């Protein structure tokens, strides 16, 4: 830039300056929101009795108590059964399944997790046939129970979060219909909302009984509930 050009150039115009300020403000707000959200999450974890209990009793997550409560109410786990856990990280549901006497337990998750003795764990995608084949190779036959504690990353917008989680449940239901043994059971997390009705209707076509369970271990104010379906039929 020449000296004449420098003298003539007055810097960015007011519109560009305003746009830049707004962009910076949005970034600061977003960063602060993430920071506040993280602080709330940490505080909630520190105050959560189930988090402390899980640590004391050797479970990998507080979610283990949800499955224990669900099983106490619905009797979906039994000795000698074959279990598939979709979205299994960090492994609490696998631990409970083995503890309750399951003979074979396999799990799959996009996230890596440490091995659990007695279980086959695949780092992969339930939508990838090769990953599913590797997981199912860990079973000697068709599964008796399919579990899914999958949930989409939350956005803070209830309806969006609900629809995204319902999409995961629909994927889990499709997996169950394809792989579950006759008479088998299915348990999955859903968020309360209107779209859940379609999932329930689909389950009622393929299972003798379908019901909702809200474990006490679910956090107060959480919209999550669990759908439990028993008596699979094609």
Curated annotation (Swiss-Prot):
Matches recorded under InterPro entries: RNA_methyltr_RlmE, RNA_MeTrfase_FtsJ_dom, rRNA-MeTfrase_E, SAM-dependent_MTases_sf
**Which terms are listed as keywords in the entry?**
Cytoplasm, Methyltransferase, rRNA processing, S-adenosyl-L-methionine, Transferase
Task: Mention any one GO cellular component term assigned to this protein in its UniProt record.
Answer: cytoplasm
Q: Which SUPFAM superfamilies match?
A: S-adenosyl-L-methionine-dependent methyltransferases
Q: Where in the cell is it found?
A: Cytoplasm
Q: Which residues bind S-adenosyl-L-methionine?
A: 91, 93, 109, 125, 149
Top EC group: transferase
Active-site annotation: 189 (proton acceptor)
Q: Which Pfam families does this UniProt record tie to the protein?
A: FtsJ
**Ranges where the record places region Disordered:** 1-37
E.C. designation(s): 2.1.1.166
User: What is the reaction catalyzed?
Assistant: uridine(2552) in 23S rRNA + S-adenosyl-L-methionine = 2'-O-methyluridine(2552) in 23S rRNA + S-adenosyl-L-homocysteine + H(+)
Record GO terms (molecular function): rRNA (uridine-2'-O-)-methyltransferase activity
Q: What protein family is recorded? A: Belongs to the class I-like SAM-binding methyltransferase superfamily. RNA methyltransferase RlmE family.
Described function: Specifically methylates the uridine in position 2552 of 23S rRNA at the 2'-O position of the ribose in the fully assembled 50S ribosomal subunit.
Q: Would you tell me the protein name for this molecule? A: Ribosomal RNA large subunit methyltransferase E
This chain is encoded by the gene named rlmE
